[in-house]
Structure formats: structure tokens, C-alpha cells
Amino acid sequence: MQKLLGLMRRCIDDYDMIRENDRIAVGVSGGKDSLVLLQLLAELRKFFNKPFALEAITIDMGLGMDYSGIAALCEKLDVPFHLIKTEIGPIIFEHRKEKNPCSLCSKMRRGALNQAILDLGFNKLALGHHYDDAVETFVMSLIYEGRISCFQPVTDLDRTGIIQIRPMLYIHEKTVDNFAKRMELPVVENRCPVDKSTKREEIKQLIFDLSQTYPDLKERIFGAMQRFPLPEWEPHGRYKRPKEQE
């Protein structure tokens, strides 16, 4: 855990993600990424030099998923847990019968999450995007939209006053996977009908295939995003790429 905390601490410091007395909500979907983020932030809270409040929010899509494991983990970590019930799943798959539901689903989930954050009085939302997510998003934007773009480490949502932070951007996906298994985190089974059949999965496979020939591909892309840099991607400290992790 110390290695992951070190990478997270460096990312937080590089982008000034956490300030004193922040009220941070972790968006917990039930997937491994958000659960690892929750575990690490709960641990970081114990010794970080800037005190901050931490709570967890889960948006229940109305697809019959069991979130009791998340509630138990939050109790163990002494992190208040908020389960926000919605009918997003039935609206998309039963009423609207969307053929390409991912975009609408994402917008509706973001809307529900942002509203919950405002209602509960948080000023920051921590999201579980990791190193590989950033690389995949960059390649997706290039291939599907013809844009040099990616989400930002810190995003200020002007209309709401919410600031999104992504503290795990220096942590590789396989490191997240291994940590989640080692800690036996309560990953929730995803009952989305289109899970694993998205454009992101296609790009993930493409990057994997290219990496067999170009082993440093992901590191080159991530480094270019910081050195170019993309908007808001230039770190405050001297860039030192995250090395391959166990």
C-alpha cells in the first residue's frame, strides 16, 4: 500500500488536488478503481499534511446491484456512505430503449452525482481514473473525434462550483487490479447489458496489441500529455514518469 500511497501523494502534490479543509466525496461505482481510490484516500487522510473530510457516494442505477459490501467497507474505513437511488437503468434500457446508451447513461449519472454532491455540501469529487484510463481517453479522442484531448487531472465545473480531482493518474491499471485482489475489496458485479462491449474496450485492446511491438507506448503517450502539455496537464513539480509497477 505504501507504494500506491506514494504515487497518489505525488500526483496530488503535482496538481495541487487537495487543500486544507476540503470536503471530498469519492464517487464509488462499485468497480475496482473507485474502491481502491476510496481505500487509499481513507488511508491518506490519517497522515496528510492538509486535513480534509472524506465521504463516499454511490449512484444506484436501478439495475438490481448489491451495494451492501461497499456499505460495510465504508463502515470499516470510518467513511460516511451515501447511496443515491435512481431509475437511470430502466429509463435507458426499458423506456428509451437506446441502441447506443453509453453517452446518455454517462450524462445522467454525472447529473445525479453532481446534484448529490451539491445537496450534501461537498466542494470536491474524487474520481478513480488511473494511468491507463488517461492514455485510452487520449487515443479515443484522437481516433473517434480527431481531437488532441483528454480529461484533466483537476477539473473546475464552473456551473456547479464542484472541482473534480483524479488522484490515481500515476497508478497503472494492473497495480490497481492487484491491490483490489490483495485487499479483497467488495467489487460489485456490473449488470449493465452493454458492459465490455464499448469503444473504450476496443481502444484498450488496440493499445494492448500495439504495446506488444512498442512496449513503451503508454509511457510515451502519458509523458507527451504532460510535456506538450495538454491543458492543465503540466505538473507543478519536475515530471518523472511513473515506472512500471507490480
Segments from the language model and where they lie:
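Short, basic, helix/turn surface patches
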Residues: 106-120, 154-160, 207, 211-226
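Residue-level signal for secondary-structure boundary elements
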Residues: 16, 20, 147, 151, ...
